[in-house]
Swiss-Prot record:
EC number: 2.1.3.3
Name of the protein in question: Ornithine carbamoyltransferase
Enzyme class at the top of the EC tree: transferase
Gene: argF
Catalytic activity: carbamoyl phosphate + L-ornithine = L-citrulline + phosphate + H(+)
Native organism taxonomy: Bacteria, Pseudomonadati, Pseudomonadota, Betaproteobacteria, Burkholderiales
Subcellular location: Cytoplasm
Organism: Paracidovorax citrulli (strain AAC00-1) (Acidovorax citrulli)
GO CC aspect terms: cytoplasm
UniProt binding sites for carbamoyl phosphate: S57, T58, R59, T60, Q84, R108, H135, P136, C137, Q138, C264, L265, R292
Amino acid sequence: MKAPSDMKHYLQFKDFSAQEYAYLFERAAVIKGKFKRYEKHHPLTDRTLAMIFEKASTRTRVSFEAGMYQLGGSVVHLTTGDSQLGRAEPIEDSAKVISRMVDLVMIRTYEQTKIERFAAHSRVPVINGLTNEFHPCQILADIFTFIEHRGSIQGRTVAWVGDGNNMANTWLQAAELLGFTVHVSTPSGYEVDSRVAGVAAGSHYKVFSDPLEACRGADLITTDVWTSMGYEAENEARKKAFADWCVDAEMMAAARPEALFMHCLPAHRGEEVEADVIDGPQSVVWDEAENRMHVQKALMEYLLLGQVA
């Protein structure tokens, strides 16, 4: 397939402008409304999405696959086990071949450089479904969920409690672009690196050694698993290091009374979050999970059709 001359990829959160995000959030609300009213919405009829998974996933696969079908399109699912990607065939060659047969590619992999190499040789838009460095689709869903429940995120405070991982990196990019503040608290040795996120040191974020202080006055507290996929060998060491970085009722009480709790899932109750928090009244994790599908539908529509009325 051949995309328009103004083709865009979505590899990091900072790939889009604040104006584009404003459109995507509005469009996601419209698309979600149609879904809730059982209205058919098939702008991508006869379009095909290729999903390439080097890292396995539940939510990423279901949200993209169901979303593309709901938009009227079709899906091809590939893993490194049943394709030549990154094995006998160079990534660049795979990109040149696959992008001649489909309209859109989503990749969930380990190294950010791998998806960037693929995109550099693709004739169609490429979406980052997750890498070790960034998770833009998840933060897109998180911010949309916040807007649904509390309005604009501009000027608000988000507390990130846990690992300085791909989620934390993406939150830093989002804060700089959309004008809010992130309080980051990680154990020693697991800090977020602003150079990876590509944001100015201290720009729109503050670092706290005490997770409770990071949560003080926050509008949103969010976290992730202590041991991400690919780091299983470090699991026991991480459990010891992260023991004080479990989001609990005391942290939620330190935040604003109307503060929300989010988690990208899967969650380990009793580790990064207590059960009474994730299953409590301030938690919006199930809306957050569903919204992956709606924002990604808006994203796919935008990448292929541009802004629509």
